[in-house]
Design a protein with these regions (language model features):
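Short acidic-glycine-tyrosine-enriched beta hairpin
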Residues: 65-80
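Ligand-binding loop in jelly-roll beta-barrel domains
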Residues: 80-100
Length: 100
């Protein structure tokens, strides 16, 4: 058991990208932030499922070519092998939780 303070962690790309609060052998938990217009390249996972839960702002998550526009309170589940791409097409920052 352990406790993590978000303030002790940093976003991968300065003010954006994933901020991993926990990386383990069976699961990762991250706070993800994108500024307006920022994106994360298309990719997939061979074994892991990924979930995104939107906390603030709006984001487009493209899964196998289908655009899913998500708002706070919505979650998307991505299966292994599904190619996904994340882009903040809004004019404001967005924040979401990622479990992987």
């Amino acid at each position: 058991m352990y406790i993590v303070n978000e303030e002790d962690k940093e976003y991968r790309f300065g003010d954006s990208g994933p901020k991993y609060l926990m990386k383990g052998p069976r699961m990762n938990f991250a706070l993800v932030q994108f500024q307006a217009g920022q994106d994360f390249k298309a990719h997939y996972h061979n074994v892991m499922e990924e979930n995104f839960y939107i906390l603030e702002g709006e984001v487009d998550i493209v899964v196998d070519g289908v655009v899913n526009h998500l708002r706070p309170g919505q979650m998307i589940h991505i299966e292994p092998g599904e190619i996904h791409y994340v882009i903040n097409n809004s004019g404001a920052p967005m924040k979401m939780i990622s479990t992987l």
